[in-house]
Amino acid sequence: MERFEALKETYPELYKYCHKAEQYVQDDPDASLLKAGKALEYMVKTLEKNQLEPVVWIHEKRTDCINELEQHGTIGEEFADELHQLRILCNDALDERKEEEATQEEAEKGLKLLTTLTVRFTAVMDKLSHMRKTGKVTPAPMGINRKKAAKAGKILALGGVIAAAALTVIFGSKE
């Protein structure tokens, strides 16, 4: 059984992209990463359309969409990080300003990530489908993204210091 065969029936378009990415790894790493990027885009858009939280708008940038999927609890932090890794790998390899072509090593790394991501994708889609069928449509909290929470805390603290300084300048010190 080939690597992406399980996708063939349920997600034929995703299967097509993944299968092509696998076929092109050795002979055309650029094409492999292009197809991996198409597979990534398909997964992100499909998750966005099927998330349980109401979608206010469809994001144009994959970065924003992945972040929102994580914030809404549709996907976990690890899944989001891996989506970003593949996104960055594909973007960097296919950057038109880059003179050299993508390497086979980059394409193999992309394929490895793609393999993991398709497993996670099907699991999340199955979970969302089950939640809709059972009427339990509130996803369980996926946990706190510690990196983002720490960054937000620093920003809030800095904002507080700036606000205090501004108030002191405006109203003067009590001394």
Regions flagged by a language model, labelled:
Residues 1-169:
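Amphipathic alpha-helical interface elements
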Residues 171-175:
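Membrane-engaging insertion elements
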